[in-house]
């Protein structure tokens, strides 16, 4: 007889293999079939269905998994310590390392339509907001939360640039320059 801890360990490894495979497959092929994900995970399609009976179940689990990875990356980047520019750079690098699956998760209609997931996504980046607030100057023309929106928009541009093959260091530098200096210099009149 198998002990419960061994069984749950094997079950967790299988679950993780399915989620990791889904991250890789769906980032490149958003409409990929569950069979493609199963093959990438090294399991049968019936195994995927045992863990995630419907595609939406897998997508919900994937969304939570990616969001949790993002939060863990934020924590590892330690954005509350050190000079603000170094803290921002560490956060940008940590988020960029998650790759294009972030675009899929945050733009997949079936995920966006889930109010529970929307609430779940709205937490976790408080440390980023804190470092952005440390770096930002009060600008009355900016609505509340603007720096956060700009940060995530630049990250989206970074994920897209990475998919297009732009070197990582150029992406990080471009995001940092955009955050700290902007991208447009108007002629002085």
From Swiss-Prot:
Regulation of its activity: Repressor activity is regulated by binding of different substrates of the LfrA multidrug efflux pump, such as acriflavine, proflavine, ethidium bromide and rhodamine 123. Binding of these ligands causes the dissociation of LfrR from the promoter, inducing lfrA expression.
Coiled-coil regions listed in the entry: none
GO molecular function: DNA-binding transcription factor activity; transcription cis-regulatory region binding
Mutant phenotype after disruption: Deletion of the gene increases the expression of lfrA and produces higher resistance to multiple drugs.
Domain named HTH tetR-type: residues: 12-70
Region of interest (Proflavine binding), residue spans: 70-71
Factors inducing expression: Negatively autoregulated.
Alphabetical list of InterPro entries matching this protein: Homeodomain-like_sf, HTH-type_TetR-like_transc_reg, HTH_TetR
DNA-binding residue intervals: 33-52
Domain of life: Bacteria
Signal peptide boundaries: none
One Pfam family linked to the record: TetR_N
Keywords, sorted A to Z: DNA-binding, Repressor, Transcription, Transcription regulation
SUPFAM superfamilies from the UniProt entry: Homeodomain-like
Task of the protein: Represses the transcription of the lfrRA operon by binding directly to the promoter region of lfrR-lfrA. Binds specifically to a 143-bp region upstream of the lfrR gene.
Quaternary structure and partners: Homodimer. Forms a structurally asymmetric homodimer exhibiting local unfolding and a blocked drug-binding site.
Domain notes: Binding of ligands causes significant conformational changes.
Record protein name field: HTH-type transcriptional repressor LfrR
Organism: Mycolicibacterium smegmatis (strain ATCC 700084 / mc(2)155) (Mycobacterium smegmatis)
Higher taxonomy: Bacteria, Bacillati, Actinomycetota, Actinomycetes, Mycobacteriales
Gene coding for it: lfrR
